Amino acid sequence: MHNSLIRKELEAGRSIIYFTQGVSMRPLLYDKNHPKATQIYLEPLTHHQLAIGDIPIFQKQSNGQLVLHRLIASDDDYYYTRGDNCVSGEKVPREYVFGYVTKIYRNGKWLSTDSKIYQAYVLVWLHSFWVRKPLMLLRQQLSKLKRKMIGK
């Protein structure tokens, strides 16, 4: 489904099911080309107040790309998000957010983001960032070193 169609459907108040793309939300969400490909159920943002830990969908100001990243903070004008597999986050104007994930399809079943198991995962994930961050930075440096050593 094309980016403009996803946004159009959600802004029209319709929910959609979509395969995720990219690696920024691993290990929760896997790319459509990965053996563990993940589908998500997106709902319009119409009457939902986003909470810390939710996964909104927004459009990047710089290139129009659609992004799913976890909400880590907010204020009156902005949402602050970060991918689960990312070190840094982004500041997103509220008007750029138009939907959010309510269900995740993996291993042959749907998992609601309201379920106790998912909420426990979010709690652990959010509070473990300061432990995971140095490990992610180390992994990035090792990947750069490996690419340099093999000449890519």
Which residues are covered by each model-predicted region?
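Extended hydrophobic leader/signal-anchor segments used for secretion and membrane insertion
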Residues: 1-152
